[in-house]
């Protein structure tokens, strides 16, 4: 199994609105999605693309704000009130094959495979099995899912 490209970096934030201002004013981001709720995961999400060197899209940042105190992101923000890097996300061509491969390696998978913010199947790997980094594995978007939200 070979991982594909880095799709995005997830950043927990107490305020998507304040974070968007930061990414626009400090990082020069111009491509910002409309925030949307994912109640099944207890979060509000917004995608920000930093500009690339050629003027195209650079790195995509997924801003994640808790919808309530029951959200896992709320717990993250209790420890780190200003927010910060939450996870990295890599693409794979086949999510079921990737899951089986990581399970075969003895890596702990956090919960079932589910549909993520880009509209494609995802799962998360425990940071203790991934060199201290919470890692999201995402099936490479196809068709309508390419645009995300």
Language-model regions: role of each:
Residues 138-143:
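Short beta-strand-to-coil "C-cap" segments at the C-terminal boundary of structured domains/repeats
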Residues 1, 11-58, 97-120, 125:
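Core segments of cupin and vicinal oxygen chelate
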Residues 1, 144-149:
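Basic/polar N-terminal segments that are highly enriched at the extreme N-terminus
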Residues 6-14, 46-59, 67-68, 73-97, ...:
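Vicinal oxygen chelate
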Residues 34-37, 72-79, 116, 147-149:
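Short, tandemly repeated low-complexity microdomains enriched for cysteine and small residues
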Residues 19, 30-31, 55-59, 70-72, ...:
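Short loop/beta submotifs within extracellular cysteine-rich repeat domains
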């Amino acid at each position: 199994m070979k991982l594909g490209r880095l799709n995005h970096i997830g950043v927990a934030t107490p305020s998507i609105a304040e974070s968007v201002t930061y990414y626009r004013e400090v990082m020069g981001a111009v491509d910002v999605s409309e925030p949307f709720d994912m109640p099944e995961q207890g979060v509000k999400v917004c995608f920000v693309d930093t500009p690339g060197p050629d003027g195209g899209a650079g790195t995509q940042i997924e801003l994640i704000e808790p919808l309530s105190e029951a959200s896992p992101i709320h717990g993250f923000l209790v420890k780190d009130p200003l927010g910060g890097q939450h996870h990295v996300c890599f693409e794979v061509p086949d999510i079921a094959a990737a899951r089986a491969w990581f399970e075969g390696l003895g890596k702990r998978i956090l919960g079932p495979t589910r549909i993520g913010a880009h509209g494609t199947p995802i799962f998360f790997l425990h940071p203790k099995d991934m060199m201290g980094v919470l890692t999201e594995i995402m099936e490479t978007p196809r068709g309508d899912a390419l645009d995300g939200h």
